[in-house]
């Protein structure tokens, strides 16, 4: 059974962008002077005049910066399936260029209706002058140098006003400077905090959109940080399945499959492997920890509704990556109730050799971070490293009294050296409750003394446990 090594918090994904591939070549239409100007990408940034500026309703950022697409391709890009390419020009820059050249482009949100409207991105500061309340506005798609003071009566962005007020109260509560609440102007430190909080909120929203674009399962992913100003990890890439390191091959095609008409009652894939069916009629796991799960695979004749296809369907629950307040970094909580013995998520990452894991383990231990998960169901040849490549499970914290249990799963790849790692609930988990598993969990559900006593990588540094459970062992490793 797989054993997870001690892990800590790391970094996050660089910006990705979307671009829609263009249609087949068509006879070129004669370009107008306006289109030629747009294609040169030389339009200068201009500041909106006071007469033009209008504080419209705020709309959430819907994605990371996008590639520059002009001409016919820009107009028709939304009709084609998006794919990732390196960023060329930011979305804000594209929007500004379109407004400058009076061009519309639905794929980047510029229409005839909003072409001349200026949108509030966030509020930076506050003051009262001659009895009138003013807010310093950061305009979406415009640099900070174009920020302007606008009277409250001109602002139609209740959510941003509410966020501004909440951020101010949060800062004052943290600093215990409650006397400044009714001041006619904000102290520079408060204004700076509010701006940083607004920028963090935008960055987390972009990251949340990135995660949901990358996932291939039903459950949605949300992100929140109400604790500090930390933004998304900078060097983390979301993947949905194992990523083999160079020199490692993972067979993705099954060698045999069942021909059952009813996999719940007929002799099925588990029987062929010498084990029992892992699930009951309610799709809950019924086997003991340490027993492998053999699901139906791509060669089986049964359909997607087969009762022996659970892990391969992916996470069905909406989860939230959140910043913990107890010093454990990022964590994961469920937003819906999860029944006991239900599949929650799969642990994925980069598959490396045990020798490479020892080398990386030294580096990670010196930095106080590691996401190494040993695949030792039968042998100890491979390890999953989720430090840079992983899914939501990358952020799940340790607990000595966890609510998730580890199981080894075999679907298309039947190589016992490379089981897939599934996490099932051990009890009913209520909405809002943090998800945890034991980093030293073995098939029996107990800590592996062998792993702790004999692993050279784990002898180097002992990481203190902060789970707070009554049965806490004191250390993660």
Swiss-Prot record:
PTM statement from Swiss-Prot or TrEMBL: Ubiquitinated by the DCX(DCAF13) E3 ubiquitin ligase complex, leading to its degradation.
Gene Ontology MF annotations: chromatin binding; histone H3 methyltransferase activity; histone H3K9 methyltransferase activity; histone H3K9 trimethyltransferase activity; histone H3K9me2 methyltransferase activity; protein methyltransferase activity; RNA polymerase II transcription regulatory region sequence-specific DNA binding; transcription cis-regulatory region binding
Predominant localisation class: nucleus
Bilayer-spanning residue ranges: none
Binding site for Zn(2+) 1: 258, 260, 263, 268-269
Pre-SET domain: residues covered: 256-314
Disruption of the gene: reported phenotype: Mice lacking Suv39h1 and Suv39h2 display severely impaired viability and chromosomal instabilities that are associated with an increased tumor risk and perturbed chromosome interactions during male meiosis. They also show a higher level of histone H3 with phosphorylated 'Ser-10' and a reduced number of cells in G1 phase and an increased portion of cells with aberrant nuclear morphologies.
UniProt region (Disordered), positions on chain: 1-59
Binding site for Zn(2+) 4: 400, 465, 467, 472
Binding site for S-adenosyl-L-methionine: 328-330, 371, 397-398
EC number: 2.1.1.355
Tissue expression: Testis specific; predominant expression in type B spermatogonia and preleptotene spermatocytes.
Domain Post-SET: 461-477
Similarity comment: family membership: Belongs to the class V-like SAM-binding methyltransferase superfamily. Histone-lysine methyltransferase family. Suvar3-9 subfamily.
The protein's assembly and partners: Interacts with SMAD5. The large PER complex involved in the histone methylation is composed of at least PER2, CBX3, TRIM28, SUV39H1 and/or SUV39H2; CBX3 mediates the formation of the complex.
Protein name: Histone-lysine N-methyltransferase SUV39H2
Organism from which the protein derives: Mus musculus (Mouse)
């Amino acid at each position: 059974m797989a054993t997870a090594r001690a892990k800590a918090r790391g970094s996050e994904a660089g910006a990705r962008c979307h671009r829609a591939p263009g249609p087949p070549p068509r006879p070129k239409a004669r370009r107008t002077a306006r289109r030629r100007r747009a294609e040169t990408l030389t339009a200068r940034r201009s500041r909106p005049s006071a007469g033009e500026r209008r504080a419209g309703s705020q709309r959430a950022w819907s994605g990371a910066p996008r590639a520059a697409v002009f001409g016919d391709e820009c107009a028709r890009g939304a009709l084609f399936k998006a794919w990732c390419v390196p960023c060329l020009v930011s979305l804000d820059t594209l929007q500004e260029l379109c407004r400058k050249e009076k061009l519309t482009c639905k794929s980047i949100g510029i229409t005839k209706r909003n072409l001349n409207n200026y949108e509030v991105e966030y509020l930076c500061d506050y003051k009262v002058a001659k009895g009138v309340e003013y807010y310093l506005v950061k305009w979406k798609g415009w640099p900070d140098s174009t920020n302007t003071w606008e009277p409250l009566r001109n602002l139609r962005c209740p959510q941003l006003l509410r966020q501004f007020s909440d951020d101010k109260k949060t800062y004052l509560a943290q600093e215990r400077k409650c006397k400044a609440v009714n001041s006619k102007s904000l102290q520079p430190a408060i204004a700076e905090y509010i701006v940083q909080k607004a920028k963090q909120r935008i960055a987390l929203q972009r990251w949340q959109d990135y995660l949901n674009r990358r996932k291939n399962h039903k459950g949605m992913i949300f992100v929140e940080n109400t604790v500090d100003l930390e933004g998304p990890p900078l060097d983390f890439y979301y993947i949905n399945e194992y990523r083999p390191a160079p020199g490692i091959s993972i067979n993705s095609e099954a060698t045999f499959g069942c021909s059952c008409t009813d996999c719940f009652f007929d002799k099925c894939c588990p029987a062929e492997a010498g084990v029992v069916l892992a699930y009951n009629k309610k799709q809950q796991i019924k086997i003991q920890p340490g027993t492998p799960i053999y699901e139906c695979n791509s060669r089986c004749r049964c359909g997607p509704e087969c009762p022996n296809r659970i892990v391969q369907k992916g996470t069905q629950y909406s989860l939230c990556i959140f910043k913990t307040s107890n010093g454990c970094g990022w964590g994961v909580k469920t937003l819906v109730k999860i029944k006991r013995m239900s599949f929650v998520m799969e642990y994925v990452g980069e598959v490396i050799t045990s020798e490479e894991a020892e080398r990386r383990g030294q580096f990670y231990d010196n930095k106080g971070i590691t996401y190494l998960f040993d695949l030792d169901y039968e042998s100890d040849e491979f390890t999953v490293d989720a430090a840079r490549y992983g899914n939501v499970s990358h952020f799940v914290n340790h607990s000595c009294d966890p609510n998730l249990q580890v199981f080894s799963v075999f679907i298309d790849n039947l190589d016992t050296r490379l089981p897939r790692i599934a996490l099932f609930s051990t009890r009913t988990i209520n909405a809002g409750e943090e998800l945890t598993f034991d980093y030293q969990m073995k098939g029996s559900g107990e800590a592996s003394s062998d792993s702790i006593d004999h692993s050279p990588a784990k002898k180097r540094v002992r990481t203190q446990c902060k789970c707070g459970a009554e049965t806490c062992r004191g250390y993660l490793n």
